[in-house]
């Protein structure tokens, strides 16, 4: 969990140049469900948060998607 928290803070400070595997590792550490339905996106959901977030699985992940993921993790932590 500590490593995931450090990675999350690094994402918050610099949303550039992250891989989808990094987002998945942080999500799993915080108990967030990760779905790869076979398309080009990865879906992150959590039962206590109404809306999930979808991130394109191709690289590079645009900073807007990384920021949306960080906001989603923050909502999960507050719920």
Can you say where each PLM-predicted feature lies in the sequence?
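Minor-groove-contacting beta-hairpin "wing" of winged helix-turn-helix DNA-binding domains
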Residues: 41-45
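Basic nucleic-acid-binding interfaces
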Residues: 2-36, 47-79
